[in-house]
Amino acid sequence: MTTHNTGIEDQTSIKPLRLALRGTDLLRSEIYNKGSAFTERERDEFGLRGRLPFTVNTLEQQLERAYDQYQNRKSDIRKNSFLQSLKVQNQVLFYNLLTKHLEEMADAIAEYSHLFRQPEGLYISPPSVEKMEEDFLEACAGRELDLGSGGIGISSAKAVIYSLVAGIDPARTLAVVLDVGTNNPELRNDELYLGWNHDRVRGEEYDSFVDKFAKLVVTHQPQCLLHFEDFGVSNAQKLLDRYATKQAVFNDDIQGTGAVTLATLTSALQVTQSKLSDQRIIQFGAGSAGLGIARQIRDAMVLVDGTDPKVAAEKFWLVDKNGLLKKGLGDKIRSDIEEDFIRKEDDWGANDETHLLDVVKKVKPTVLIGTSTAKGAFTEDVIREMAKHTEQPIIFPLSNPTRLAECTPEDAQKWTNGKALVSTGSPFPPVDLGNGKKYTVAECNNALVYPGIGLGAIVSRAKRVTDKMIIRAAQVLGEMGPASADKPEASLLPDFADSQKVAVAIALEVMDQAIREGVADFDDKALLHDKDARKIYLESKLWKPEYREYVYDPDGRK
């Protein structure tokens, strides 16, 4: 978020931009470059006349040419390479192309973590810890951040989604990698490895290093949303707990995965017409994602249905490679797993088997969620046993990529006679149910939820991202799913092609929730009491991939 009282720049009344860049420097700036769309006046003023072809193009003409070039790339790799190249040349054209062809390019966009690996953003390592503030300020020079995130490769991709889906100005985002070393022997022995070639830092030194970075964000970009990405299972929840009450932070691996799964479950319950707190849920896989999902759904039971927290936790049975998490496992259970999620030994008996099929037989779950990366773990026996005891089994094999899914949607439907409500962690084609019907498989993709949460937090200038804000976002997304009791074969989630509309709807409700909890900080206090005005205000803040008029100013932006 911006650090000025005026907030994010109003996109409905944009004045000409004053730039100090000229000539080749301007053409090399992916943020300000217009390529052949620079006007005659701008070419004269910025020393570009001899550097560009004669004809001045419109953005629409450039878009047509770029789309032709994209289509002429026959393989996915070449298409992705073209998009990568375009992004580092001309961001307005890049985002415009994706926006205009969102449905066609949806799969590629949703998998951006595999596309963009450019050396962009800020790299921070322990050996340069004393220079951390200097490096951070240099990276932020002349920029007011809305968004900062950790981990260059995937976080650069997440920033793209924030801009494309939620209208966050890409110039106001900063991808950051906190490079704390690696224990990967292949990387350590690679002479060309570019990271810090050192044993992975842990314990107090690690905590101090991350803490210093987080404090820099609070000090110098106090209204920036800090998006944590790809922090290991032992650190993710610990860091979220540490900073969640101090600043606006969001951990996508925990909260994003939890929120989109809660949204998908909310949609499924609209089909079954049952309450969240009435479910019996087996969570197969108790890593950061699985535990994040269990916590998110439990918290929703508490906040939405008014269930006692302890009773809500007892609606879950967590299973991992050691079997059901019960007290007898002792130190095989991670220390960050709450006591309420661990089953009592007396409930099972000393000789009871507690692996997945046995747990399914005893629990008779209504919901089965997989985050185990154990391919095929939801076997025919498991699914058929579940289907014996519930009319419409809710089955979410969320492990990705596709080859690691706990089961395929086709098998889930076959083993339940077409009654299952299925969502996956990777794209799957529709399943033929017979009788002329096809089941549309919802992809439980975080990209449908975190852009709207971030946008709502940024525009409301939220001091924190609260649990209720995230739960409300999940409810909104779930309510937008096409599936219903009358049409159970429809997708449980909106199509990614509708993600921009989804983000705005989520953001509005997140803003409302921020107001209800007293964490919003609008300059115009009238916005606190007028939802229609907030909608207009939100829409005025959305960055759009359009060219602005430039005026040369030696003291302008560089």
Task: Write out the residue ranges for each language-model feature.
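Adenosine-phosphate binding glycine-rich loop
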Residues: 32-33, 250-256, 269-272, 393, ...
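Short acidic, glycine/serine/threonine-rich loops at helix termini
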Residues: 137, 146-153, 187-192, 236-242, ...
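Long hydrophobic segments that form regular secondary structure
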Residues: 352-418, 446, 461
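Generic secondary-structure signature for well-ordered alpha-helical cores
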Residues: 44, 48-51, 114-117, 167-171, ...
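N-terminal ligand-binding/catalytic initiation module
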Residues: 2-247, 535, 541-556
